[in-house]
């Protein structure tokens, strides 16, 4: 039997690793679009500032093609480079497009009509077309300029320092748009505003050169649609990571923003490692976790084998990101989320109420975290030289605060089905703690989403146990989402068209699932493949089910 178990463990690990090709292998070639990238060979600040504004206008132009925007973005991100010709070679590595370099000597006075170099492959018609695109801004752009201040674009720029201040102020806004371009691009821009405020405080972003929100949105959309640009930005992020303490201003800025971009789309995986494996509490010994612990081990090996680019799987649209979706390890994910909601107040802003969240194991995590908060790590205590009396004192202190919940510490049971805005909020002492940024970052790959439209969860009894008996419903949306586990004590008729996701073999119901169609009776499928019809008197029948990913 032991040999079978070892073979199963090896099989699980090899499943994650065997599909990878050799590093550096060239994929089959597909059709490529021609992208014209503009190169300025002189350090003239006036010409480079005009090119900066020209690229912004091309990106925001309402009639520009995708290739025009891609070329403008690559040119924009290359402007701080002393040798643009060499820097743009980073984009040549992309198998998605054919990069054509066009050397530019400047612009005609008072216009955005390009003056090409003799070596530039630009026709007169193309030059005229680019000039028209630069003037063709959409009506959503106010004052005929991408900037908030209308006079910024026409200001003289005759010093390198002036150009760098303006260029970095624009580029830092573009980099902030990269942070959410693949994971939560349609979410409110609260995190972007906080980052803008941070960089203004650091002196990296001058408020006078802020772009209009519509211009920022168009930049983000162009980056999201172009794999060539995102591959180019990934190379830039890797260059920034390799820099030492004595780095130039631009790559220090890119390295700082890169911390927000790294591991986006993998938040559920890293939170599971942090709160499930990192705590090392006794529920990890449950037999139900054995297979999923092997899965996590294989994922950690896969992440290590992917190398430096593993941090940017979402930015590169890498298919390996699907392997890290929490739908592949739902039980230990549910347990980790329960632990995290107790230990970390910022977890209240993370959407962990996924369709596959197991309420039973979530509650195990909650209760374990509450009971184990006062335990002492003996190895650390030995390193600190704590006496048995001091260890007991620490345990009693934490237990006393956990029972009383202290001043300003959010208490009460944690319910995964209540939207974060309706959870009990911390006191003012915690208002300066930044929110957990990646609230919806991996929704695309695992299909998870929290309850929307302000739906209320069932009431919670003392001790953290959910009471699924009928509660007064506030609006019709709640009536569609929730129904009680025990219809005989409910004031809701038994024949309503709802689904119950019931844990096979368990007496209590911890997770509800609803009928999205709402127009026909459907059977509810349990987590172990059992089908439970809407009629509670009918016997359950075995049926093979699949998990959500």
Swiss-Prot record:
InterPro entries: Paramyx_ncap
Top-level taxon of the source organism: Viruses
Keywords: Capsid protein, Helical capsid protein, Host cytoplasm, Phosphoprotein, Ribonucleoprotein, RNA-binding, Viral nucleoprotein, Virion
Cellular component terms per the entry's GO annotation: helical viral capsid; host cell cytoplasm; ribonucleoprotein complex; viral nucleocapsid
UniProt KW Nuclease keyword: no
Compartments it resides in: Virion; Host cytoplasm
GO molecular function: RNA binding; structural molecule activity
Region (Disordered): 437-469, 517-549
Positions of post-translational Phosphoserine modification: 439
Polar residues bias spans: 531-549
Any single GO BP term: negative stranded viral RNA transcription
Comp. bias regions, Acidic residues: 437-447
Name of a matching Pfam family: Paramyxo_ncap
Described function: Forms the helical nucleocapsid (NC) with 12.71 N subunits per helical turn and a rise of 5.3 Angstrom per N subunit, protecting the genome from nucleases. The encapsidated genomic RNA serves as template for transcription and replication; encapsidation by N is coupled to RNA synthesis. Forms the encapsidation complex with the phosphoprotein protein P. Before encapsidation, the newly synthesized free N protein, so-called N0, is chaperoned by P.
Notes concerning its domains: Ncore is globular and carries the regions required for self-assembly and RNA-binding. Ntail is an intrinsically disordered monomeric domain in the C-terminus.
Quaternary structure and partners: Homomultimer; forms the nucleocapsid. Binds to the viral genomic RNA. N0 interacts with the phosphoprotein (via N-terminus); this interaction allows P to chaperon N0 to avoid N polymerization before encapsidation. Interacts (via N-terminus) as N-RNA template with the phosphoprotein (via C-terminus); this interaction positions the polymerase on the template.
Family: Belongs to the paramyxoviruses nucleocapsid family.
Protein name: Nucleoprotein
Gene of this entry: N
């Amino acid at each position: 039997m032991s040999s079978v178990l070892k073979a199963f463990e090896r099989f699980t690990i090899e499943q994650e690793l065997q599909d990878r090709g050799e590093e550096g292998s060239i994929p089959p070639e597909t059709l490529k679009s021609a992208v014209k990238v503009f190169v300025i060979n002189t350090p003239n600040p006036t010409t480079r500032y005009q090119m900066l504004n020209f690229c912004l206008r091309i990106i925001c132009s309402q009639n520009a093609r995708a290739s025009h925007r891609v070329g403008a973005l690559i040119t924009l991100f290359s402007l701080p480079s002393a040798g643009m010709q060499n820097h743009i070679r980073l984009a040549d590595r992309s198998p998605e497009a054919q990069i054509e370099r066009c050397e530019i000597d400047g612009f005609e006075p008072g216009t955005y009509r390009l003056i090409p170099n003799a070596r530039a492959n630009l026709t007169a018609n193309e030059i005229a077309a680019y000039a028209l695109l630069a003037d063709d801004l959409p009506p959503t752009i106010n004052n005929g300029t991408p900037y908030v201040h209308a006079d910024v674009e026409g200001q003289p720029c005759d010093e390198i320092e002036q150009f760098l201040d303006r260029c970095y102020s624009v580029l830092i806004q573009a980099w902030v748009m990269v942070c959410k371009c693949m994971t939560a691009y349609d979410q409110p821009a609260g995190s972007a505003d906080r980052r803008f405020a941070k960089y203004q405080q650091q002196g990296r972003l001058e408020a006078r050169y802020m772009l209009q929100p519509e211009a920022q949105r168009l930049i983000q959309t162009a980056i999201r649609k172009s794999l060539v640009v995102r591959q180019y930005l990934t190379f830039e992020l890797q260059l920034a990571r390799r820099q030492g303490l004595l780095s130039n201003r631009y790559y220090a800025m890119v390295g700082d923003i890169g911390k927000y971009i790294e591991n986006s789309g993998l938040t559920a995986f890293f939170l599971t490692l942090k709160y499930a494996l990192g705590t090392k509490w006794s529920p990890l010994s449950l037999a139900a976790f054995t297979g999923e612990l092997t899965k996590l081990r294989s994922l950690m090996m896969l992440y290590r084998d992917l190398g430096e680019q593993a941090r940017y799987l979402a930015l590169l649209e890498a298919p390996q990101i699907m392997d890290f979706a929490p739908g592949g390890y739902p039980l230990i994910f549910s347990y980790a989320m329960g632990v995290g909601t107790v230990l970390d107040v910022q977890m209240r802003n993370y959407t962990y109420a996924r369709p596959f969240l197991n309420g039973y194991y979530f509650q195990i995590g909650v209760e374990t975290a509450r009971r184990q908060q006062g335990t002492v790590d003996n190895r650390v205590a030995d390193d600190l030289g704590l006496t048995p009396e001091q260890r007991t004192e620490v345990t009693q202190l934490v237990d006393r605060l956990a029972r009383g919940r202290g001043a300003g510490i959010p208490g009460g049971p944690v319910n995964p089905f209540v939207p974060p805005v309706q959870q009990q909020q911390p006191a003012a002492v915690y208002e300066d703690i930044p929110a957990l940024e990646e609230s919806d970052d991996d929704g695309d790959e695992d299909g998870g989403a929290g309850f929307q439209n302000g739906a209320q969860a069932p009431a919670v009894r003392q001790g953290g146990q959910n009471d699924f008996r009928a509660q007064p419903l506030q609006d019709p949306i709640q009536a569609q989402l929730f129904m009680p586990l025990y219809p005989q004590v409910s004031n809701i008729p038994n024949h309503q068209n709802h689904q119950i996701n019931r844990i096979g073999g368990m007496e209590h119901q911890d997770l509800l699932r609803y009928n999205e169609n709402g127009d026909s009776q459907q059977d509810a499928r349990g987590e172990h493949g059992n089908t439970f019809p809407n009629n509670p008197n009918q016997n359950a029948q075995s049926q093979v089910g699949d998990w959500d990913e």
